Amino acid sequence: MTTIATATLPKNVQYPQYDRSQLRSRIVHFGFGAFHRAHQALLTDRVLNNVGGDWGICEISLFSGDTLMSQLREQDHLFTVLEKGADGNQPIVIGAVHECLNARLDSLAAIIEKFCEPQVAIVSLTITEKGYCIDPATGKLDPTHPRIIHDLENPTLPQSAPGILVEALARRRERGLPPFTVLSCDNIPDNGHVVKNAVLGMAEKRSPALADWIADNVSFPGTMVDRIVPAATPESLAEIATVLGVDDPCAISCEPFIQWVVEDHFVAGRPAWETAGVQMTDDVLPWEQMKLRMLNGSHSFLAWLGYLAGHAHISDCMRDDVFRRAARQLMLDEQAPTLTITGVDLLACADSLIARFSNPALKHRTWQIAMDGSQKLPQRMLDGIRVHLARDSRWPLLALGVAGWMRYVSGTDDAGQTIDVRDPLVDKIRLRVAQSDEQQRVDALLGLEEIFGRDLPHNAQFVAGIRAAWQQLATHGAREAVARALNS
């Protein structure tokens, strides 16, 4: 079978220019998803092209991905990233992946032992918020999570990411091996502390001495990741096959823009990521806050309200002047004033984001971005609203964004079509939707403490703002409500 590993590819395809036989699995990565392929793996590949080295990646998937992993093996662990710009596309074959393991194809035991190999220096993760098994209300490990319960009863046969990390570190400690750095690359706030809380929470329940060793010897750098990477579709894979002249089932498309800011706290070394344009810093928090509110907050605003209004893609929203102006106004008038970052031109940042959102080549679906809103709403909108409430400043578009999420998860768009709502809390949400009418819906959903906390549902100004925005959506529909908010 001809694959990208054996085919003669077109001359415009960038191909690894380093000796892949020198790679070792020095990075073990949880979650061979679209974002990782187009971001961390690509940037590590760029380092290898620039300066060489042996920083290979071993990809790990636990509960799915066996088909993808089989396909990756068939093409010598190579895959393609197609960077799609308004002025043309650039195909890049990534060679940084050295091997892959899957619980179904291999075994959980083999996966855990991989973490214990002496050369492993970094364990990185893109497992989404759900994968860390954190209780959103406390920020700590959720002891009631089924996988955590299983792992505490079966510590040497763990099923969760925290359980596997702790078991691997326990074995390294017992064998006298040095620890590794745990690097969350997920687009969640304070991701370094999230994974640290998960790992230490699990370790403390197993052994206080083990927890102390991990706290003293393992580092958990924070990161800020930024690149728009839509999920692969049959259409995107067909386009890439046309570009390459051969199928690549592991390929992914993305925008040209890429940014990665990483706290430079590594206990066992790291690739020279700075040679690939990565920003190494002492504190990632201001960067992360800017990205979550400016980019992700406006992305979610467009996803929920744009979907309700009938826009299938973010670029469709950008062709609608009402949504385009609203996204920019949301960034500059309501999100930017809540940020603590200094030395960054936020006006230029907003203009850049609008241009990125407008890229018609990406076909980034509003429905995809609208997923998992219960996990995204707090950091993308609610934290900024808290700043406005403390200052007694205005936040009409943020209110509309929150109400837009409520309309979206209620399950019907402005044309009366049923919405396929995907969310970790979908059962709780559906119950509250079913038990409330339109007049009660806001209060019913505000009762979800894991989203809104204990403070916001008891803040009269907040509740009034969301009720008013909900009423605008119920009366006028999403597009007209957004237009009215622009002029309020």
Segments predicted by a language model, with ranges:
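Substrate/ligand-engaging "lid" and interaction regions
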Residues: 1-488
